Amino acid sequence: DKLYVLDTRNPMFEGVVDAPRLFVVDLASNEIEGTLILSEGAYHPDSYINDLRVDEKTNRIYMTDSAHAGLVVYNLDDNTSYRILDNHKTTKAEVDALSIQGKPFTMPVQSDGIALDTLNDTLYFHALSGYSLYAINTSDIEKSSNDVLAEKVRKVATTGAPDGMIFHQGNVYLADLEKQ
């Protein structure tokens, strides 16, 4: 078993200092067995790579970019990475403010939540500052233009604004920041 630890390389949200990376920890030995560094073009100077899901079927890791809307795909077969749905409406914040515990939260957060349904080979994603849950089949994910990929994305639900998602036993579970 492995643990993937994401280093955003963006301290205090002040910009990426060098390529974001994943540390791969072997849980049996408790040792770092490798470092996966994102390729140029997979991130922007203001990126904040936030959350990830490992797809053992496709041998890829899917990540969200919460600062510069988009998803990042890391291919474990050839150690390359690329962006998809970059600055696309499905990965962008839908609102400028949320109400959290009765107080306005005015920092729009782009693509944030991500969940992987390994039974149906579906990747779900959601902007934190938004109410739309989107999905794409993992077989449709490829290095392609936004327009080509956008045709394969579907809106599956209107939800609360989540800061956390998981797929478990046939269900997508989402947090709801505004209704705690």
Predicted regions and their residues:
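Asp-box/WD-like beta-propeller blade repeats and closely related beta-sheet repeat scaffolds
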Residues: R9-N59
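A short loop-to-beta-strand structural motif that recurs across blades of beta-propeller domains
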Residues: P20-F23, G70-V72, S132-Y134, Q180
